[in-house]
Every structure is written in structure tokens, then in C-alpha cells.
């Protein structure tokens, strides 16, 4: 199975990069992982709604360039569905069983995802009603993908 994580912005913090590298290494026995970083747009401090929408659309266009027609797209969205780790592993397994060999997870920038990206998504997922820095969220997503594969393989995992 192929897993792509398409996210806005680059990871600058060494501790986050180290965590991403660790989970990437752990996941290598379960899937082919591809992490794609698209350029984030600078957001003015007092951006208007119109300016925010323009930024989201620019970032969204960059994201969509990396999504192929046959990808099963899971958008990370505050309004998405919250599920348990076991349900998340079922979602990944159902993709595999239905012939979706590539799952593309999409993480927006500080303003979230454009309507175009949300419309393209096959599934909208929320981890929490809380807001997390998108750089940190990448680590959280990788951990949950790793946990999902361990669940699917019947391997022990921390509950």
C-alpha cells in the first residue's frame, strides 16, 4: 500500500523532523510512504476573509497538483468525522480491500484547506475539535497511521 501525506509548509524544528523520520522508518515495513510539502503562503497579520480565501485557494491548487485520480483522499478538517484508532485502521484496510492502493492524506496550512481540496476528498477526518500546529499534526498523523498498521497486523500497540 502507498501512503502519501501532502501538507502545507516545511518542517523547520529538528525535534519534529526527528519524530517524522522515526515514524517514516517504522512505517517502511508496512507501506511505501511519500511525504510531500507544498509551499505555504504568507498570511498578513490582519488578513481579510477575501485574502484568507485567496491564500487557501493558492495552497489548495498546489495540493491538488499532487493528487492523482485514483488516490483515496483523506482531508484533515475540523468539521470531519472523529473516529477511534481501531476505526481508522478499518478505514485504511477498507481502502486496500476496495482496490485503493494509494491513500493521500491532506493537511492544510494555518488557514485550513480550500473548498476545492475538501470537495476532492473521499473522506474528511478530524482528530479533535482542538487546533494543532500543522507541523506537529504531521507527527500525530504518522503515529496514527503506524498504529493502524500495527492493529491490522495483529501486533501489540499501546491502548
UniProtKB/Swiss-Prot annotation:
Gene Ontology CC: one annotated term: cytoplasm
Q: Which reactions does this protein catalyse?
A: pseudouridine(1915) in 23S rRNA + S-adenosyl-L-methionine = N(3)-methylpseudouridine(1915) in 23S rRNA + S-adenosyl-L-homocysteine + H(+)
Residues that hold S-adenosyl-L-methionine according to the record: 76, 108, 127-132
* CDD domains cross-referenced by the UniProt entry: RlmH-like
Top-level taxonomic group: Bacteria
Which InterPro entries has this protein been placed in?
Alpha/beta_knot_MTases, RlmH-like, tRNA_m1G_MTases_N
This protein's UniProt keywords: Cytoplasm, Methyltransferase, rRNA processing, S-adenosyl-L-methionine, Transferase
**Family statement:** Belongs to the RNA methyltransferase RlmH family.
Name listed for the protein in its UniProt record: Ribosomal RNA large subunit methyltransferase H
Q: Upper lineage ranks?
A: Bacteria, Bacillati, Bacillota, Clostridia, Eubacteriales
Amino acid at each position: 500500500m502507498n501512503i502519501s501525506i501532502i501538507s502545507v509548509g516545511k518542517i523547520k524544528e529538528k525535534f519534529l523532523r526527528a519524530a517524522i523520520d522515526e515514524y517514516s522508518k517504522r512505517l517502511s515495513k508496512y507501506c511505501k510512504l511519500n511525504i510531500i510539502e507544498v509551499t505555504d503562503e504568507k498570511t498578513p497579520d490582519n488578513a481579510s476573509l477575501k485574502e484568507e480565501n485567496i491564500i487557501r485557494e493558492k495552497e489548495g491548487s498546489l495540493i491538488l497538483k499532487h493528487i492523482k485520480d485514483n488516490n483515496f483522499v483523506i482531508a484533515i478538517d475540523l468539521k470531519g468525522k472523529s473516529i477511534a484508532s481501531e476505526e481508522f485502521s478499518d478505514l485504511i484496510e477498507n481502502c486496500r480491500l476496495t482496490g485503493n492502493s494509494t491513500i493521500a492524506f491532506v493537511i492544510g496550512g494555518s488557514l485550513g484547506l480550500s473548498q476545492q481540496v475538501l470537495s476532492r476528498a473521499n473522506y474528511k477526518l478530524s482528530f479533535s475539535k482542538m487546533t494543532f500546529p500543522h507541523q506537529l499534526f504531521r507527527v500525530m498523523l504518522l503515529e496514527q497511521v503506524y498504529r493502524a498498521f500495527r492493529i491490522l497486523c495483529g501486533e501489540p500497540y499501546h491502548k
